[in-house]
Amino acid sequence: MYITIIGILLAVVAVLIFFDKEDKHVELLIYTAVVLLMFFIVAFRPIGIDKDSIMYTEMYSDPDFMVEPTFKWISSISSLVLGDVRGVFIMYALLAIPLKAWSIHKLSEYSLLAVLIWMGHFFIIHECTQIRAAVAVAIFLYAIRYLSEGKKKKYLLAIMVAMIFHYSSLLYLPLVFLGNSSLSTRWKYFLYLAPLIGYLLAILRIDLLELVPIPFFQDKIKVYQEMKDKGVMAGDDINIFNVAFLLKLLIYYFLLIKYEVIKDKARYMPIMLKIYAFSTLVFLLFSFMPVLAYRGSEMLAVVEIVLIPYLVYAVRPINVARLLVVLFVFAVFLQDVFYNNLLLQSVS
C-alpha cells in the first residue's frame, strides 16, 4: 500500500508535467501540494516499511548509542513532547523536506520535473530511509547557491551545520573550491575524463583513500571493512557496469556534449556537472565497499534533481525530453522498490 501511494503520486506528477503551460503560479501551487503530501507520507509512515526506521527506533531507546548530537537532541524533544519515536520522524521530515523543496525551487526552472526526480529516487533513499542524511543533503542543496556565488565562508558554515546531522557531510568540504563560472577547456577535459579515470582505478583496484591522511576517513573505512569481513554487510564488490549507473553516465555525457548549446539557459549547469562528476568518482573509488560507494555517491548525486531536467533544453520537441525524464524516473523507482527492496508493501 505504501509503495502504491508513492507510485500513484509519481504517476500524477508525471502526467501534470505534460500540461505545463508556463504558468508559474499554478506550477508553484502544484509543487507545494506535492511537497506537502511527501511530508505526510514520510512523517507518518509505518515503522519497518523501510530499511532504517527500526534501527532509528532502537537508537531512540538507547541514549548511549554513538550518533550525531542532533539525533540525541531531536530524540529528547520527541520524548518530551510526544513520548514516542514518531516525533523523531516528524521532526526530521520537517527539517529536510521544506528546506530541500525550497532549495530545489530556487535552483531549478522546472520544479515539477525536479520534484518528480526527487520523489522517484532520492525521496526513497533519504527522506524515507536515511533521515539524518536527508537533512544533511537538504542543507547541501541550500548551500550550492553560496558556492555558485563564491560565498565560500557561508558555504562552509552551512556544511558544518550539515555535519552535526550526518558526519558524512565532511564529503562536501572539498567542494568549496568549485565555482559556477563557465566551463574552461581544462574543466571540460576533466569532466570528460573523470568517470574514465574512476573506472581505470576501480578496475586496477587502486585504493587512493589509503593516502588520505584524515582520521575520520581512515576510521570509517576500517569500520566498514571489519563489518564487511564479518559478513554484517554486503561483501561483494559493486558491479561498476550496472545498467542504472551506465544510464546516468549516458545522461551526464549527453548534457556535457550539449553544454555549449544550453549553458545560457541552464544557470547552474557548470557547478552541477562538476559535483556530478565527483559523485561518479566516489562511486567508482569506493566500489570495493558497497555501503560507502552508494551512500557517499548519492549524497553528491542529489544534484541529479536539478541537472537531469536540463534535458528539456537539449532535446526537441520538449515533450520528448519530458518523456525521457519520466521513463528514467520510473525505471529507477521500480529498481529501488522491487529489485533493491528499499521499501516494503506492508509491515508484518
Where are these regions (language model features)?
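Transmembrane-helix motifs of polytopic, lipid-linked glycan transferases
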Residues: M91-L107
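Membrane-interface transmembrane helices that cradle and orient dolichyl/undecaprenyl
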Residues: F140-K154
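Short acidic/glycine- and proline-prone juxtamembrane loop motifs at membrane-interface regions
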Residues: C128-A134
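TM-lumen/periplasm interface segments of multi-pass membrane proteins
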Residues: M1, I17-A93, V337-S348
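Signature aromatic-anchored transmembrane alpha helix within multi-pass, membrane-resident enzymes
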Residues: Y192-L196, R316-Q335
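Transmembrane-helix signature of polytopic, membrane-embedded enzymes
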Residues: I104-G120
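Membrane-interface alpha helices of multi-pass inner-membrane proteins
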Residues: F123, K154-L178
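Alpha-helical transmembrane segments and terminal signal-anchor/GPI-anchor hydrophobic tails
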Residues: I54-E58, M66-K72, S181-Y294, L342-L343, ...
